[in-house]
Amino acid sequence: IGVGGLGDSQQAGYSLFELGMEIERLERTLEDRETQLEILGEIVLDREMESDLFVAGKPLKDGWIVSNFGQRPDPFTGKLAFHSGIDFTNGRPGSDINTVAAGVVVWSGPKSKYGLTVEVDHGKGFTTRYSHAEKLFVDVGEVVKKGQRIASVGSTGRSTGPHVHFEIYKNGRVVDPASYINRTDR
């Protein structure tokens, strides 16, 4: 013999009408919470994307600078010439060249004196160039993530040895990458 049970709605303290109203209120509350969670998720995603699009870092994880931006003796002629980027090496041909920010590949192929080159548009006026590669691993139109391998260190084009020539353009004008290598502030 069973004992207990739900009884009728009057014993529970709610009429069927009140119970229906309470269920509707809870459904609205649940919908509001779902909307709030979706908005919070979008905010977090936007912040992560903004962080990934932020141009900062160097294209070789364990590389060092062998030639800075600005005037320098041309390695082929010895005459003073403008160097439009920073050259990094790690002494190991074939090492990974990585993007310093997420973006869209706008060039992937040979480019006269630059040799095999990848260019990435990061939005907000920023484009980066990675040159003298041995191999390219991305195609034009491809979306790349921050830190993604896009090429390997080589010595193609006008080059004296394995390295990556790294340039940054802001609104179409080349800028010194040095101020972006250790950049942390937005």
Residue ranges of model-derived segments:
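Non-catalytic extracellular/periplasmic "stalk"
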Residues: 1-68
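Catalytic cores of peptidoglycan-degrading enzymes
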Residues: 58-186
